[in-house]
């Protein structure tokens, strides 16, 4: 368990106040499809 999500791990684009683990440094959370709440941590 780490405090940040590694590349390829699931993430939440819009948390709406939910407890979430941010992507690690240098990664961004890209949604699976436009408007999706969930995505995957990827490099810029």
From Swiss-Prot:
SUPFAM superfamilies: omega toxin-like. The record marks 9 as: May be important for binding to chitin. Keywords: Antibiotic, Antimicrobial, Disulfide bond, Fungicide, Knottin, Secreted. It is found in: Secreted. One of its GO terms (biological process) is killing of cells of another organism. Its main location: secreted. Disulfide bonds join 4-24, 11-29, 23-41. InterPro entries: Antimicrobial_tachystatin_A. Transmembrane segments: none annotated. Granular hemocytes, small secretory granules. It holds the Pfam family Tachystatin_A. One of its GO terms (cellular component) is extracellular region. Exhibits stronger antimicrobial activity against the Gram-positive bacteria (S.aureus (IC(50) is 4.2 ug/ml)) and fungi (C.albicans (IC(50) is 3.0 ug/ml) and P.pastoris (IC(50) is 0.5 ug/ml)) than Gram-negative bacteria (E.coli (IC(50) is 25 ug/ml)). Binds to chitin (8.4 uM are required to obtain 50% of binding). Does not cause hemolysis on sheep erythrocytes. Has no blocking activity on the P-type calcium channel. The presence of a 'disulfide through disulfide knot' structurally defines this protein as a knottin. This is Tachystatin-A1. It comes from Tachypleus tridentatus.
């Amino acid at each position: 368990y780490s405090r940040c999500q590694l590349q390829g791990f699931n993430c939440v684009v819009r948390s709406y106040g939910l407890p979430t683990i941010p992507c690690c440094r240098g990664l961004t959370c890209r949604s699976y499809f436009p408007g999706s709440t969930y995505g995957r941590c990827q490099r810029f």
